[in-house]
């Protein structure tokens, strides 16, 4: 065999798997079709957060008087400079990924790969043999195939999230189809940049994967920024920059200079089409608990297996899959219920474990403790009191079942809850820990102390 391992894709799952394999002396080849660093680094997590940080600064400037600051003169948005900074960040991190791969003594090739059989991969008209294959080919935006959509896409009116990060200017009117995580983040971004934003959502609230209290707070915040949210709306067609939809059977329309379609993502599994892998009734490739396909030397990790489309979940799967090949059992499998997730709105949303909605659906007994950030000295000092911390506990043992944080720094705080859940700590362990004061983090401790008084004393 030419290699011990061939990895298709150098995104978060693939390059971490490559690094781990290389450092464990596996002769490894990684093949990347387009982006070293994947969607996340090039046209996803990193560039959006770069722009959202600038949007947050704009929000601070708009509300400078609330902080006792008077600005003389007009602050102007330089969109081209923002895009330049975004690309500089991306380029720097892409270079870092390539350095990681090279440093692990892993070979790399640019090109589109196809798996010929369980031991052969073809790229750039050359076939390579291998003992193991890891597929980490990621995902792509899902499109709507409705009347007029293809024409509107070709004309540049209807765009996806990748195109939204490379617009020539800030659109006056920006329409978002889909009120999930990606759609809501872009709504915040362009509303802060000055666009008139409308969200078209198919169900009765945005962020439907979250509890209703989360959706309500973020909806209120968006509306305060001038964003119009239309729920229970079903998109039916497009005519250039005009989007038609129905609410309760009545057809309406909205005009947008740009219309972002953000309705989920599709796994890139085409490289496996020549194989007869076991699939379920939805044509999804079936995996076992070791992330192996029915051909057991072929693994699927990251977005392509659709388990949880998050970069940090992919990181863990990358290490875990290689660990299975090495038969070392040193890396724990990624557990969905202990993996945190973040939404980079302003304030941010972060959660881990069960939501209340999930606990109720699965009929799991729980008690809840929560506090708004108006109880936090640091939040008051920072003028950042919009949000709360809530946690759910096993009423008998005090085990933490889940938690949600809405705060200006929620994405930084949630790691504390994830670590606690990963190590099976309880409400008592957190309540007995000492948090620095004043910080936003101490609200987690305060919520646990409140829970003990309310339920466990």
Swiss-Prot record:
<dbReference type="InterPro" id="IPR012999">
    <property type="entry name" value="Pyr_OxRdtase_I_AS"/>
</dbReference>
<keyword id="KW-1015">Disulfide bond</keyword>
<dbReference type="InterPro" id="IPR006258">
    <property type="entry name" value="Lipoamide_DH"/>
</dbReference>
<dbReference type="InterPro" id="IPR050151">
    <property type="entry name" value="Class-I_Pyr_Nuc-Dis_Oxidored"/>
</dbReference>
<feature type="binding site">
    <location>
        <position position="113"/>
    </location>
    <ligand>
        <name>FAD</name>
    </ligand>
</feature>
<feature type="binding site">
    <location>
        <begin position="262"/>
        <end position="265"/>
    </location>
    <ligand>
        <name>NAD(+)</name>
    </ligand>
</feature>
<dbReference type="InterPro" id="IPR036188">
    <property type="entry name" value="FAD/NAD-bd_sf"/>
</dbReference>
<keyword id="KW-0274">FAD</keyword>
<dbReference type="GO" id="GO:0006103">
    <property type="term" value="P:2-oxoglutarate metabolic process"/>
</dbReference>
<dbReference type="Pfam" id="PF07992">
    <property type="entry name" value="Pyr_redox_2"/>
</dbReference>
<dbReference type="Pfam" id="PF02852">
    <property type="entry name" value="Pyr_redox_dim"/>
</dbReference>
<feature type="binding site">
    <location>
        <begin position="178"/>
        <end position="182"/>
    </location>
    <ligand>
        <name>NAD(+)</name>
    </ligand>
</feature>
<dbReference type="GO" id="GO:0006090">
    <property type="term" value="P:pyruvate metabolic process"/>
</dbReference>
<protein>
    <recommendedName>
        <fullName>Dihydrolipoyl dehydrogenase</fullName>
        <ecNumber>1.8.1.4</ecNumber>
    </recommendedName>
</protein>
<comment type="subunit">
    <text>Homodimer.</text>
</comment>
<feature type="active site" description="Proton acceptor">
    <location>
        <position position="437"/>
    </location>
</feature>
<keyword id="KW-0520">NAD</keyword>
<feature type="binding site">
    <location>
        <position position="303"/>
    </location>
    <ligand>
        <name>FAD</name>
    </ligand>
</feature>
<dbReference type="GO" id="GO:0004148">
    <property type="term" value="F:dihydrolipoyl dehydrogenase (NADH) activity"/>
</dbReference>
<dbReference type="GO" id="GO:0050660">
    <property type="term" value="F:flavin adenine dinucleotide binding"/>
</dbReference>
<keyword id="KW-0560">Oxidoreductase</keyword>
<dbReference type="InterPro" id="IPR023753">
    <property type="entry name" value="FAD/NAD-binding_dom"/>
</dbReference>
<dbReference type="GO" id="GO:0005737">
    <property type="term" value="C:cytoplasm"/>
</dbReference>
<keyword id="KW-0963">Cytoplasm</keyword>
<dbReference type="InterPro" id="IPR016156">
    <property type="entry name" value="FAD/NAD-linked_Rdtase_dimer_sf"/>
</dbReference>
<feature type="binding site">
    <location>
        <begin position="32"/>
        <end position="40"/>
    </location>
    <ligand>
        <name>FAD</name>
    </ligand>
</feature>
<feature type="binding site">
    <location>
        <position position="49"/>
    </location>
    <ligand>
        <name>FAD</name>
    </ligand>
</feature>
<feature type="binding site">
    <location>
        <position position="235"/>
    </location>
    <ligand>
        <name>NAD(+)</name>
    </ligand>
</feature>
<dbReference type="InterPro" id="IPR001100">
    <property type="entry name" value="Pyr_nuc-diS_OxRdtase"/>
</dbReference>
<keyword id="KW-0676">Redox-active center</keyword>
<comment type="function">
    <text>Lipoamide dehydrogenase is a component of the alpha-ketoacid dehydrogenase complexes.</text>
</comment>
<feature type="binding site">
    <location>
        <position position="311"/>
    </location>
    <ligand>
        <name>FAD</name>
    </ligand>
</feature>
<feature type="disulfide bond" description="Redox-active">
    <location>
        <begin position="40"/>
        <end position="45"/>
    </location>
</feature>
<comment type="similarity">
    <text>Belongs to the class-I pyridine nucleotide-disulfide oxidoreductase family.</text>
</comment>
<dbReference type="InterPro" id="IPR004099">
    <property type="entry name" value="Pyr_nucl-diS_OxRdtase_dimer"/>
</dbReference>
<keyword id="KW-0285">Flavoprotein</keyword>
């Amino acid at each position: 065999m030419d290699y011990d391992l061939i990895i298709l894709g150098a995104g978060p799952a693939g390059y971490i798997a490559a690094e781990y394999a290389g450092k464990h002396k596996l002769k490894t080849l990684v093949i990347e079709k387009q982006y070293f660093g994947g969607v996340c680094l090039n046209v996803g997590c990193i560039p959006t957060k770069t722009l959202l940080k600038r949007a947050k600064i704009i929000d601070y400037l708009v509300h400078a008087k609330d902080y006792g600051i008077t600005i003389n003169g007009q602050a102007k948005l330089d969109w081209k400079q923002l895009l330049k900074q975004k690309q500089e960040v991306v380029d720097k991190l892409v270079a870092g990924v390539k350095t990681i791969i090279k440093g692990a003594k892993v070979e790399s090739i640019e090109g589109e790969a196809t798996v010929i059989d369980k031991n052969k991969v073809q790229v750039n008209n050359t076939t390579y043999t291998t003992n193991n294959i890891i597929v980490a080919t990621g995902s792509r935006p899902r499109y709507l195939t409705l009347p007029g959509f293809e024409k509107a896409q070709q004309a540049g009116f209807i765009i996806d999230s990748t195109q939204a990060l490379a617009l020539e200017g800030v659109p006056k009117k920006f329409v978002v189809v889909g009120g999930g995580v990606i759609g809501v983040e872009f709504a915040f971004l362009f509303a802060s940049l000055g666009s008139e934003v409308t969200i078209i959502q198919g169900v009765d609230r945005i962020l439907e994967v979250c509890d209703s209290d989360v959706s309500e707070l973020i909806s209120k915040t968006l509306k305060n920024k001038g964003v119009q949210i239309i729920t229970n709306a079903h998109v039916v067609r497009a005519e250039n920059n005009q989007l038609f939809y129905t609410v309760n059977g009545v057809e309406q329309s909205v005009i947008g200079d740009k219309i972002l379609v953000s309705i989920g993502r599709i796994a890139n599994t085409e490289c496996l089409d020549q194989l007869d892998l076991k699939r379920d009734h939805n044509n999804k490739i079936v995996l076992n608990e070791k992330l192996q396909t029915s051909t057991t030397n072929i693994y699927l990790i990251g977005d392509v297996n659709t388990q949880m489309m998050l970069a940090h979940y992919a990181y863990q799967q990358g290490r875990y899959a290689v660990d299975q090949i090495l038969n070392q059992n040193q890396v724990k499998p990624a557990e969905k219920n202990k993996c945190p997730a973040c939404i980079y709105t302003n304030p941010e949303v972060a959660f881990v474990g069960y939501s209340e909605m999930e606990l109720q659906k699965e009929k799991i007994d729980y008690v809840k403790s929560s506090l708004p950030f108006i109880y936090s000295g640091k939040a008051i000092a920072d003028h950042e009191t919009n949000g709360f911390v809530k946690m759910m506990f096993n009423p008998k043992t005090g085990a933490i079942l889940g938690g949600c944080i809405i705060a200006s720094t929620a994405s930084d705080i949630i790691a504390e809850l994830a670590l606690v859940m990963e190590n099976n700590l309880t409400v008592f362990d957190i309540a007995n820990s000492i948090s620095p004061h004043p910080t936003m983090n101490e609200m987690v401790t305060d919520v646990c102390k409140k829970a003990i008084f309310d339920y466990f004393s």
